[in-house]
């Protein structure tokens, strides 16, 4: 007890430890063997006295001790040279070092190595030091017991963007309502000047607390009386979302400042999604007449026919009906539906329109139909009682149709955009109750055989818009005036439609063979009038060939079935100078040739460009008259030539008037006839023949020429024209 009193008296003089000094004699300038050690020499006077203090180590009450050297003071009294707190230095030791009892080298106090192991939270040789700066994501701080007048500071720092959460595992400090004796103080920052979050004392474990930044400062302070077990805390770096602050399955979203916000599910609100929104719904508007509606999964159609806010209804119509209005409606927050309720209207989808067809929607008109029943009522009853109207078009239902649809009974009118085309199919079509259109789909095809201002006496000046010129490359042609690879006019044919030309088969095959010449070595020219190839004509169209189809019965020896179809790679542009010729039906074949005008036309194949007037030479034409096949065979036999005129051929001779400018053996060409037409008062021209064979040199008008009878191949031609 006396030892503890002494200790409390001398604590106030601890500052003398490093500054107290006394005059000493010269004999003490070296080690004085009478003192505990060399460290005491400068503090000793004439004589050195010492006494031994006995203490107990807290671990097992092990006896420990140390020596306090003393000196005589001015009054010759024994006075402590070094003031020491006594046994309190051992209180924080977990295990103690033991000195030499009474020995001269007992130097615990000078060396400061009283303890070999410290209690938790303490360190140093005397286990009196505590506190540190901690930079870690998580950890713990424990202070196991504590002495009087202790002061410890800890600074906890975690990564930027995080906050520090502090949790208490144990608290045992002297209790005071104001916590002004023994306490643990927590500040929101990294130093003692930061804002105080809380001061703790007593033994009731506090709730956890959290910093606003990435650091906390802890200060422990004890006074000079009473000591307890200390405290134990853990810390961890956290984000605002670590504590799962969002209720009702809300999603926590952290930001860089350590704060957070909650993304709430539908039906919840508040900072933590803690408020439940009163669920609203919309009354089911039902499906439109002649239609139906679809609800998405989870729309929540209740027994009371209500649909949850946020869901949409999609509307559809039955066949032959079209939706007018909103295709979908959404249930809004105010329990109201977006848009207006749609209706299903009888309508027809506009039919597809072919090329060159012009479609026009006719204005709404009353359509009248009188049935036999109308006549019966009109005849049987008086006018006053039977004012019966004919059937008529009903009023249009309300609502607009989407683009591409027309109301019931709407009429569409069709015509062609070009005067060179004629319409096939219906001129008008009506929208029916079935949702389909009446009539047949219209299309526009080129007008065939149209030739205006024809004059039989002026054949040399006439243009034949269906005349097609076939050119071949000059490879292998023995003509010095032609360079290799240049184009040579070889035959004439006729344009049947925008992609088809008919030609004699011997023009597109190797001489005396059925093998077809490469299409890359041939081309077709339309709109041609002058023979000279160097004479530029704006009306000309030079077209590549995609395929050549020779009649399968073609005989290159007898020239039987001498006919072929040329398919054009690109469409021919129909104009005043380029038009197709008509094909003749078998029933339209000429029975009385003298009653009709039959013309052969073509260009002279072999032409001398040096001859006078060659630049102005045009297509040649002349009238012909068919003759009997036997008569034709007999004439050739009389001229020493044996020929056979088959059913696919016919023979003809030139008429003397008007004077012809053509020689079939030099030009080849096509034969056309002018027949009456129900659509044109001028008639229309029909293809009846292709020049096939004849005399090789003589051009006498009485000599016969063999032609391919085109009407025989009408079905084959139409099949390959598609």
UniProtKB/Swiss-Prot annotation:
Residues of the CUB domain: 130-238
Keywords, alphabetical: Disulfide bond, EGF-like domain, Glycoprotein, Repeat, Secreted, Serine protease homolog, Signal, Sushi
Residue ranges of domain Sushi in the record: 280-346, 393-446
Stretches assigned to the Peptidase S1 domain: 447-722
Top-level division of the source organism's lineage: Eukaryota
Chain ranges of the EGF-like domain: 237-274
A GO term for molecular function: calcium ion binding
Residue spans crossing the bilayer: none
Disulfide bond entries: 130-152, 179-201, 241-252, 246-262, 264-273, 282-331, 317-344, 416-444, 491-507, 632-651, 663-699
Annotated function: May play a role in regeneration of skeletal muscle.
Family membership noted in the UniProt record: Belongs to the peptidase S1 family.
The protein, known as: Inactive serine protease PAMR1
Source organism: Xenopus tropicalis (Western clawed frog)
Taxonomy of the source species: Eukaryota, Metazoa, Chordata, Craniata, Vertebrata
Gene name in the database record: pamr1
């Amino acid at each position: 007890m006396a030892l503890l009193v002494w200790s409390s008296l001398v604590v106030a003089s601890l500052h003398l430890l490093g500054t107290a000094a006394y005059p000493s004699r010269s004999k003490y300038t070296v080690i004085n063997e009478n003192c505990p050690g060399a460290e005491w020499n400068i503090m000793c006077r004439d004589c050195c006295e010492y006494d031994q203090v006995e203490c107990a180590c807290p671990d097992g009450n092990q006896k420990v001790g140390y020596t306090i050297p003393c000196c005589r003071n001015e009054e010759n009294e024994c006075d402590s040279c070094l003031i020491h707190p006594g046994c309190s230095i051992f209180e924080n030791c977990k295990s103690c070092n033991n000195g030499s009892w009474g020995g001269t080298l007992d130097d615990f106090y000078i060396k400061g190595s009283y303890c070999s192991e410290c209690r938790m939270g303490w360190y140093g040789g005397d286990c009196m030091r505590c506190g540190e700066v901690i930079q870690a994501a998580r950890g713990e701080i424990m202070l196991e017991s504590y002495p009087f007048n202790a002061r410890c500071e800890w600074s906890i720092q975690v990564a930027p963007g995080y906050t520090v959460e502090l949790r208490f595992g144990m608290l045992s400090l002297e209790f005071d309502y104001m916590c002004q004796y023994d306490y643990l103080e927590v500040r929101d920052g990294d130093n003692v000047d930061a804002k105080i979050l809380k001061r703790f004392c007593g033994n009731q474990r506090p709730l956890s607390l959290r910093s606003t930044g990435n650091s906390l400062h802890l200060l422990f302070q004890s006074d000079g009386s009473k000591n307890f077990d200390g405290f134990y805390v853990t810390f961890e770096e956290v984000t605002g979302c670590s504590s799962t602050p969002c209720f009702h399955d809300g999603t926590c979203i952290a930001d860089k400042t350590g704060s957070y916000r909650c993304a709430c599910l539908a039906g919840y609100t508040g900072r933590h999604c803690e408020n439940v929104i009163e669920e609203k719904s919309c009354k089911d508007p039902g499906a439109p007449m002649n239609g139906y509606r679809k609800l998405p999964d989870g729309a929540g159609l209740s027994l009371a026919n209500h649909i949850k806010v946020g869901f949409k209804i999609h509307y559809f119509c039955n066949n032959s009906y079209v939706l007018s209005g909103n295709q979908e409606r959404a249930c809004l927050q105010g329990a109201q539906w977006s848009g207006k309720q749609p209706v299903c209207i009888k309508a027809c989808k506009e039919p597809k329109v072919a090329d060159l067809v012009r479609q026009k929607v006719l204005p709404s008109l009353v359509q009248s139909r009188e049935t036999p029943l109308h006549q019966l009522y009109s005849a049987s009853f008086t006018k006053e009682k039977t004012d019966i109207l004919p059937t008529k078009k009903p009023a249009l239902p309300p609502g607009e149709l989407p683009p591409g649809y027309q109301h019931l009974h709407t009429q569409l009118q069709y015509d062609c955009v070009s005067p060179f085309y004629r319409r096939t199919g219906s001129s008008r079509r009506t929208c029916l109750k079935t949702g389909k259109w009446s009539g047949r789909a219209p299309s526009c095809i080129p007008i065939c055989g149209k030739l205006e201002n024809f004059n039989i006496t002026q054949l040399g000046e006439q243009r034949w818009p269906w005349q097609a010129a076939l050119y071949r490359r000059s490879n292998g042609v023995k003509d010095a005036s032609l360079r290799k690879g240049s184009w040579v006019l070889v035959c004439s044919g006729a344009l049947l439609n925008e992609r088809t030309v008919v030609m004699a088969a011997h023009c597109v095959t190797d001489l005396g063979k059925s093998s077809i010449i490469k299409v890359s070595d041939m081309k077709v020219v339309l709109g041609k009038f002058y023979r000279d190839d160097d004479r530029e004509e704006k009306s000309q169209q030079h077209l590549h060939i995609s395929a050549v189809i020779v009649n399968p019965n073609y005989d290159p020896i007898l020239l039987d079935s001498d006919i072929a179809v040329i398919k054009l790679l690109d469409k021919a542009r129909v104009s005043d100078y380029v038009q197709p010729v008509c094909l003749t039906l078998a029933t339209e074949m000429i029975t009385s040739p003298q009653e009709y005008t039959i013309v052969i036309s073509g260009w002279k194949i072999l032409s001398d460009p040096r001859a006078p007037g060659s630049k102005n030479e045009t297509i040649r034409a002349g009238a012909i008259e068919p003759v009997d096949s036997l008569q034709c065979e007999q004439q050739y036999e009389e001229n020493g030539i044996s020929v056979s005129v088959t059913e696919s051929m016919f023979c003809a001779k030139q008429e003397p008037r008007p004077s012809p400018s053509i020689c079939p053996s030099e030009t080849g060409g096509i034969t056309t006839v002018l027949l009456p037409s129900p659509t044109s008062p001028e008639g229309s021209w029909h293809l009846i023949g292709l020049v096939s064979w004849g005399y090789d040199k003589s051009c006498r008008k009485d000599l016969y020429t063999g032609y391919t009878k085109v009407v025989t191949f009408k079905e084959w031609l139409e099949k390959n024209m598609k």
